């Protein structure tokens, strides 16, 4: 390092502590980057890469950005998942001996960004910290630095389950300890696309102990400690706005895994990944940014406590029934700014005068809001506003201190009102009167000299001056003026009298700016005291905002208050898919009933493609989610149970599990439901088994239906193209066939989008192909093939067989290229239960059936004993490979 200049040595010393970040190194009016940072930053930011002499034989790569524009460049890097360490000059270059002392004042990362393009006002920006314990459990702690919110939970289950919970937080960055395995880190970076950071310290930092008073579990405290230590290390500033840690447990809320949230498009659409077109888009009528964030949190975690849901529903009903109360509340909420993030800016010391003016305007609305809610005859409302302080003393303080139209910068003056500080008033008097005196002097000098164009001006270099054009220089009295500057067409002068006043005025103006800055920073410290009260107010106002949002959308869209029942029954009259109905924008939407009494668990849904099966299934899920977040639902009448979980397999393969086929994803999601669902769950399976051969697909579909029916008892909607499965209604007493109706008119299919009892008579697949405008010749050929197939013997559905309780699917039937007889005594029974794809003529032929040898019989016996649903995909593949290898050995 000694071969470099002292400044480059200083850079390298600082950089050594921030190897995983870009180092923005302050040099005068620029932030400079050197070596690899410069090469990479020049590429990412599309700025010029240059070089400089650093003392070694080779020139050092260098690039830089102006300090006043650095914010935008930092945002660009953080948006791409990078970290940026900001290194400032911490001493005056004029007084420095040797190299100016520099220190990193902040490490900006994806999870610690406070403002910018990446921060959506209606979304949290969580930083996650994950701690792994020897017993296989994990603790997950999250912090939103912009609002001060902190949460922690204990997690058990597979690594995939843990990762899905991490993903559900929406965190862009996760903090782990250095013991995490490479495989675990790869899943975090590649699967979840998160920035990885490291922190080994887990003790709660000094001064933050009060935030974990309600946390007693050592595991949870370790996770929070890791999170807090990382935040302190990166931010290097006051964290007065951090809120007490909230403990939550996943079993306190309805569980909806990430796949299901995506399939249902709760907060973003599948295709565009945008809010528009999602359920959140429809329900979001909030007027405040913090209300929008709370709405999304509620949607991520619907309630499962019947009493809490009913409390919300009653408040929504109050707002629905009182139009004037609701409209008055909405008007006041429009004037309320983001109290949570304003409090965060106060704590961080980057709040400006305009922010405090917004805070005052927000607080002016609070007393009327609290008073209106206090008049309601509602225990939930009374409890909600209990302890809410309108902070009237803060409102008064800000009212007498901050100007009505302050500048953006707090270093330019003109931010403090007259009358707030005596010394400031004195300086302003001198400055104001001095300027008045100068205006009078200008008039007097014109009168004395008779030069009407004479003027008194000011610039930062020469101060005040008297300017006279060269044509009028002869009119100036001798000895009165002292030459100060010569211009092309004029001369500038000064007088003793003007010098004296200049000194007074400039001193006053300089002192005004400095005093205003000092007064503002002192005011900011006074506001800090109110941070806890502001955060409590923010929660109250956010909740009221979400409830009025529910009421507004419920009235606009003609939703109805659901009735919650402890029975396992669903009664939805004229239910609608809320988002599809909204997108149709006034066009006729066909409502559908969903009536499943306690003794009816499974709807087997058949019907044409494009007829609305998937929409009907999603509709039920969205109605239940809306009900359990406390919103009215799209129906004319709704009686619903409280579901503990929702499992879905609807739509295209999810890309969260990379490298898996559609069928594998289907099976993984089916396994998830089968392993975790209870009789209080809701299962929605759309076309399970379509990703494999017809034999396999139909067999698996039937086995899954039977298992759900017999072993789980969850309310289930199961759509299928296997019309042969509709005979299951005869053997499964809690299964009912329903179909989406369609009619044929003049050779064309008309979808009625109406759910009716019974099985569909045909699928109309060729008609759908016609709608897609496939070639006429292709359509004609498809009709010929269909006629031939329909003339053949139909597939026979196997009769139900008695299986052990732990088995999920019936015994597999081995199919080789040639029919095989295993044991003569079993052939008849197996033929009776086999699915036949052969025509009547072919299947009736008598064939000699070779018998399996001992090795093949042994392999078949092993296959029969395998419980696929207890195996991971990799284990199943390895087992298949082992058996195949065994058969191939001579």
Curated annotation (Swiss-Prot):
GO terms for molecular function: ATP binding; ATP-dependent DNA damage sensor activity; damaged DNA binding; mismatched DNA binding. GO terms for cellular component: cytosol. It comes from the Bacteria. Keywords: ATP-binding, DNA damage, DNA repair, DNA-binding, Nucleotide-binding. The keyword Transferase does not apply. GO terms for biological process: mismatch repair. HAMAP family: MutS. This is DNA mismatch repair protein MutS. It comes from Bacillus thuringiensis (strain Al Hakam). The lineage of its organism: Bacteria, Bacillati, Bacillota, Bacilli, Bacillales.
